[in-house]
């Protein structure tokens, strides 16, 4: 009891929530919303904490409805797919390099293969260009479909923008209603606090009312945060729409200006390269003719000189005869030396054999050791 009185003495005077035009503007409301504010405030019933817990739930349901509806229409990968396809268009365009049409040709001795090589290379490149052009047109068609989806998405984002604005307004209504009801409950709690006495029922009623006031104050704070989040969503939606529109415009530029201009430039480059190749072909033909004449003259000189040298040459060269004679003399000398060495080796072998034979006979004619011992004992 004393504690309750002390708390009452410490509290500041209660100020009723005044819905002035300035206050309403801060909450995103107008004077026409005041009746709705009072109607929403009456939903909070004294002695029913559940009404505080459910306060503002209809706003969440409103948000969930339009968010789910948009999510059913939106695929997060749409923008990624559009960007990926545009990247593929650029990659395909860059893959067509007109450089191969003007590569340096090898100098061939015959004119026919040179012309054939030029024709095959040009034909192959044109076939490659046709294939790449078909791929680019297919990718452009796919991106155009995605672009139409993005344009429709912007219309859905307009609906989302309107829904978020309505959410912001509804949150403002609930915040104002909550503050109105909060001031009333606080005033009611202060009145009860002064007459609580020693009645346990009144004490509990006051405690429940204080708890309800605290919960409602917390709920109002949450709604204020949600309203600010909704307000932040509005410029976010507009930025997304602006990005979508820039992507749509960029694709229009690529499809209607860039790709046709690229095709025209490619055809111009192809024509210029054909002219360049024609000049290079004529130059290559002239170079081949001059090179052929030079090589024929050099070949004539080489064969004539070699023929004259062969006609003045002896059947057998003197150097060959000298080498043959030197080899023959060396062969005779080597044979004689080998024969002499063989005679000497045989003589040495006979001497060694005779010595071994004498040694063997001497060993065989010697008396045994036992007989020598008997002779010594006698």
Swiss-Prot record:
Transmembrane segments: none annotated. Disulfide bonds: none annotated. Keywords: Plasmid, Tellurium resistance. InterPro entries: Toxic_anion-R_TelA. GO terms for biological process: response to tellurium ion. Belongs to the kla operon, which is associated with cryptic tellurite resistance, and IncW plasmid fertility inhibition. Belongs to the TelA family. This is Protein KlaB. It comes from Escherichia coli.
């Amino acid at each position: 009891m004393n504690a309750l009185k002390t708390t009452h003495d410490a509290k500041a005077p209660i100020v009723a929530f005044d819905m002035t035009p300035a206050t309403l503007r801060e909450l995103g409301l107008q004077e026409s919303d005041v009746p709705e504010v009072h109607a929403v405030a009456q939903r909070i019933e004294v002695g029913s904490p559940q009404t505080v817990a459910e306060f503002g739930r209809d706003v969440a349901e409103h948000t969930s409805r339009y968010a789910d509806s948009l999510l059913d229409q939106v695929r997060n990968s749409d923008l990624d797919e559009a960007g990926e396809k545009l990247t593929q268009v650029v990659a395909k365009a860059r893959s067509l390099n007109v450089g191969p049409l003007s590569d340096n040709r090898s100098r061939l001795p015959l004119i026919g293969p040179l012309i054939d090589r030029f024709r095959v290379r040009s034909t192959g490149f044109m076939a490659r260009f046709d294939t790449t052009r078909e791929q680019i047109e297919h990718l452009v068609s796919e991106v155009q479909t995605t672009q139409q989806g993005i344009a429709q998405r912007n219309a859905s984002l307009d609906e989302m923008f309107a829904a978020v604005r309505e959410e912001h307004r509804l949150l403002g209504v609930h915040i104002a209603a909550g503050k109105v009801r909060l001031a009333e409950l606080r005033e009611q709690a202060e009145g009860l606090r002064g007459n609580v006495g020693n009645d346990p029922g009144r004490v509990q009623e006051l405690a429940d009312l204080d708890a309800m006031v605290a919960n409602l104050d917390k709920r109002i704070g949450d709604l204020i945060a949600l309203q600010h989040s909704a307000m932040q969503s509005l410029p976010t939606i507009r930025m997304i729409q602006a990005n979508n529109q820039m992507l749509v415009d960029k694709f229009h530029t690529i499809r209607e200006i860039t790709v046709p201009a690229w095709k025209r430039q490619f055809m111009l480059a192809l024509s210029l390269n054909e002219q360049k190749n024609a000049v290079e072909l004529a130059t290559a033909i002239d170079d081949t003719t001059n090179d052929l004449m030079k090589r024929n003259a050099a070949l004539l000189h080489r064969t004539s000189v070699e023929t004259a040298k062969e006609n003045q040459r002896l059947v057998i060269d003197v150097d060959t005869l000298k080498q043959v004679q030197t080899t023959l003399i060396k062969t005779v000398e080597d044979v004689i030396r080998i024969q002499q060495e063989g005679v000497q080796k045989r003589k040495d072998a006979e001497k060694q054999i005779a010595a071994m034979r004498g040694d063997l006979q001497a060993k065989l004619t010697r008396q045994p050791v036992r007989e020598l011992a008997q002779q010594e004992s006698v």
